[in-house]
Regions:
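Primarily the dimerization/phosphotransfer
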Residues: 1-38
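Conserved catalytic submotifs in the C-terminal HATPase_c
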Residues: 46, 80-85, 102, 107-118
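Short alpha-helical segment of the dimerization/phosphotransfer core of two-component systems
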Residues: 54-59
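Helix-loop junction within the histidine kinase core
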Residues: 70-81
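Short helix N-cap motif at coil->helix boundaries in the Bergerat
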Residues: 86, 169-177
């Protein structure tokens, strides 16, 4: 079974790498269209271009998740920690999700204490990826014209980074299962690979931290990442 798992991991990694190149080329071509380098587009062409870009971005995101998963499974997760301000991670996540939030009229609110927050010694790319993924989920699971909250607070020797939505919430029966690979809450209509939360948990735990959820049906969900300051 170990040989089979190893072959599967290698196959997924190879395919993911092969997919990234043509997807990136598609996105570059679409950028040329958006910049009107080949002439102005009519309304129908603009809508088609946006649709293609959204799907290409989603596909690129999935390949990224697969590559992250194979690194974890192969024990090849490389950490490059550096001193990082929590607010920088929050700002990165917001920037990455602002277009999607605007599309659905979702207001992103920031909660950040006025007192000086301690810095983190983390792999900023990986923790930013986690926060971006959590905020993306919050936006996608929110009602149109709703709001989501992203923030940070100090808890003794820890810093908590959190994302909260006010959507339908998660049944308590699935509070642990949502962190399993490929798990999808039964009945959910939001598209996804079922890998994001699993990889996020792996990244956080690789830093010696925890990723937990607080959720109640009909009241939304709050994902909390706790890291040593």
């Amino acid at each position: 079974f170990k040989e089979l798992d190893s072959a599967k991991t290698t196959f997924i990694s190879t395919i993911s790498h092969e997919l990234k190149t043509p997807i990136s080329a598609i996105l570059m071509s679409l950028q040329l269209l958006e910049d009107k380098r080949v002439g102005a587009l009519n309304d129908e062409q603009e809508q088609l271009s946006k649709s293609i870009k959204e799907n290409a971005d989603r596909l690129l995101g999935i390949t990224g998740e697969l590559l992250n998963m194979t690194q974890v499974e192969a024990g090849k997760l490389q950490m490059m920690p550096k001193i990082t301000k929590p607010i920088e991670l929050i700002e990165y996540a917001i920037k990455a999700n602002q277009v999607q939030a605007d599309k659905f009229g979702i207001q992103i609110e920031v909660e950040y204490p006025e007192e000086k927050m301690p810095k983190l010694f983390v792999d900023s790319e990986k923790i930013a990826w986690v926060l971006t993924n959590l905020l993306s989920n919050a936006v996608r699971y929110s009602k149109e014209n709703g709001r989501v909250v992203i923030g940070a607070k100090r808890e003794k020797e820890f810093v908590e980074l959190y994302v909260q939505d006010f959507g339908k919430g998660i049944d308590p029966r699935y509070h642990q299962s949502i962190f399993d690979r490929y798990f999808r809450v039964p009945g959910t209509k939001v598209q996804g690979s079922g890998l994001g939360l699993s990889i996020s948990k792996d990244f956080v735990e690789a830093h010696g931290g925890t990723l937990t959820v607080e959720s109640e049906l009909g009241k939304g969900s709050k994902f909390i990442m706790r890291l040593k300051a």
